[in-house]
C-alpha cells in the first residue's frame, strides 16, 4: 500500500512554508508526501532556510503513484511572499480544501495542516471557527473532538472556543457520553489500545459534594456511571488541580473547558504537542501553535511540534 500524507502550506504569510522545509529533512522513504501549496512560495522558503526540497509537480494526487515527495501547485498567489491579508487567508483555505477533498475520496490517508489565521481566513469568506470545524463539515462528521496529544499527556476538550461563563450550559450528560464513547472508539481503531478515560470535574474540588456546584452530581457522575455500564474504562469526576500528576501513557483526560486542559498540556508538552482531530474518516494532525506572523519569514520558527505531528501520522499509518 502506498501510504500518502498530505501537507498543507497553511497561511503563506506565516511560518508554515518554513516549517515544511525544515521537517522535510525527516521524510521517510516508505511514505509518499504530497504538499498542497505554492511552488514559488516554497522556493522562497528554500532560499530563506537553505534547505532544498526535491519534489515532483503534479496536477492530481492520483499521479503520485511512486513513493516520494510531490507538490500540487494551486498557484493562488500572484507573488511568492505576501503580508497577512485577505490574499493569504484565501490561499490557506484553498490549500486546505483541496487536501480535504482528496482525503475524503481516500486518495491520501492523513493530513498535516499548517496553521491558518482565523481572522484573515474569515475575511476571505471562510465560514468556520477553524480548520477542525471545516474538516468535520466537509467529511460529514457529526461527532468529533479536538485532542492535544503527546506521549506525556493526552487531553480532549468537551468545549473549545466559548466564553467561560457559558461552559456550564454545555456540561451535559449526553455531551460527556458522546465524547467518552468517541475517545474509546478512536483509540481502539487508530491507536490500537484501550485508553483509561479520566473525566475532570468542572468546579473547584470537583464540586465538593455539591457545595461548590451541582454539575458533577447532576451531569458528570451520571455520564461516567453509564459509560462504565457500557464497558468503557473511565473514572471521574477527578479534582482538576491534581488530576494531571504523573499521568500514564494510556490516560486520556476529558476536560470541561479550553484552559482546564490546555494550560497543563502546554506546560508539560509545549514543543512536542500535536493537535489531533478525533472522529474524522482520515488522520489529521497539526502543530500546537498558530501562524506566528511576528517571526514569519525570519528563519526563526522551531519545527519540533510540526515534526511530532508528522511522526504521529506516520506511526498511526504504520498500524494499518
UniProtKB/Swiss-Prot annotation:
A divalent metal cation binds at residues 161, 205, 258. It catalyses: 4-(phosphooxy)-L-threonine + NAD(+) = 3-amino-2-oxopropyl phosphate + CO2 + NADH. It is found in: Cytoplasm. The gene is pdxA. The active site is located at the dimer interface. Homodimer. It comes from the Bacteria. Belongs to the PdxA family. One of its GO terms (biological process) is pyridoxine biosynthetic process. Binds 1 divalent metal cation per subunit. Catalyzes the NAD(P)-dependent oxidation of 4-(phosphooxy)-L-threonine (HTP) into 2-amino-3-oxo-4-(phosphooxy)butyric acid which spontaneously decarboxylates to form 3-amino-2-oxopropyl phosphate (AHAP). Its main location: cytoplasm. Its EC number is 1.1.1.262. Pathway: Cofactor biosynthesis; pyridoxine 5'-phosphate biosynthesis; pyridoxine 5'-phosphate from D-erythrose 4-phosphate: step 4/5. One of its GO terms (molecular function) is metal ion binding. This is 4-hydroxythreonine-4-phosphate dehydrogenase. Keywords: Cytoplasm, Metal-binding, NAD, NADP, Oxidoreductase, Pyridoxine biosynthesis. The keyword Glycoprotein does not apply. Its cofactor is a divalent metal cation. GO terms for cellular component: cytoplasm. Gene3D superfamilies: Isopropylmalate Dehydrogenase. Substrate binds at residues 132, 266, 275, 284. It is an enzyme of class 1 (oxidoreductase).
Amino acid at each position: 500500500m502506498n501510504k500518502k500524507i498530505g501537507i498543507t502550506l497553511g497561511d503563506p504569510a506565516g511560518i508554515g512554508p518554513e516549517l515544511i522545509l525544515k521537517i522535510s529533512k525527516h521524510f521517510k522513504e516508505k511514505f509518499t508526501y504530497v504538499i498542497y501549496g505554492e511552488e514559488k512560495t516554497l522556493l522562497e522558503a528554500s532560499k530563506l532556510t537553505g534547505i532544498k526540497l526535491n519534489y515532483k509537480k503534479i496536477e492530481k494526487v492520483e499521479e503520485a503513484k511512486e513513493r516520494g515527495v510531490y507538490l500540487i501547485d494551486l498557484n493562488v498567489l500572484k507573488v511568492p511572499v505576501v503580508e497577512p491579508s485577505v490574499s493569504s487567508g484565501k490561499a490557506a483555505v484553498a490549500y486546505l480544501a483541496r487536501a480535504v477533498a482528496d482525503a475524503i475520496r481516500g486518495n491520501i490517508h492523513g493530513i498535516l495542516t499548517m496553521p491558518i489565521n482565523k481572522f484573515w481566513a474569515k475575511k476571505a469568506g471562510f465560514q468556520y471557527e477553524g480548520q477542525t470545524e471545516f474538516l468535520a463539515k466537509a467529511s460529514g462528521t457529526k461527532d468529533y473532538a479536538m485532542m492535544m496529544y503527546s506521549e506525556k499527556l493526552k487531553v480532549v476538550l468537551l468545549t473549545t472556543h466559548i466564553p467561560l461563563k457559558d461552559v456550564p450550559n454545555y456540561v451535559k450528560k449526553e455531551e460527556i457520553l458522546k465524547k467518552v464513547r468517541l475517545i474509546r472508539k478512536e483509540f481502539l481503531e487508530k491507536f490500537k489500545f484501550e485508553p483509561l478515560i479520566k473525566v475532570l470535574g468542572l468546579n473547584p474540588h470537583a464540586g465538593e459534594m455539591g457545595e461548590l456546584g451541582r454539575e458533577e452530581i447532576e451531569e458528570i457522575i451520571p455520564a461516567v456511571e453509564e459509560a462504565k455500564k457500557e464497558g468503557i474504562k473511565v473514572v471521574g469526576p477527578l479534582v482538576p488541580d491534581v488530576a494531571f500528576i504523573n499521568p500514564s501513557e494510556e490516560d486520556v483526560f476529558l476536560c470541561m473547558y479550553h484552559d482546564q486542559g490546555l494550560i497543563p498540556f502546554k506546560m508539560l508538552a509545549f514543543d512536542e504537542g500535536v493537535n489531533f482531530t478525533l472522529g474524522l474518516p482520515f488522520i489529521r494532525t497539526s502543530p500546537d501553535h498558530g501562524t506566528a506572523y511576528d517571526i514569519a519569514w525570519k528563519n526563526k520558527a522551531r519545527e519540533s511540534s510540526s515534526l511530532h505531528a508528522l511522526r504521529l501520522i506516520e506511526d498511526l499509518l504504520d498500524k494499518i
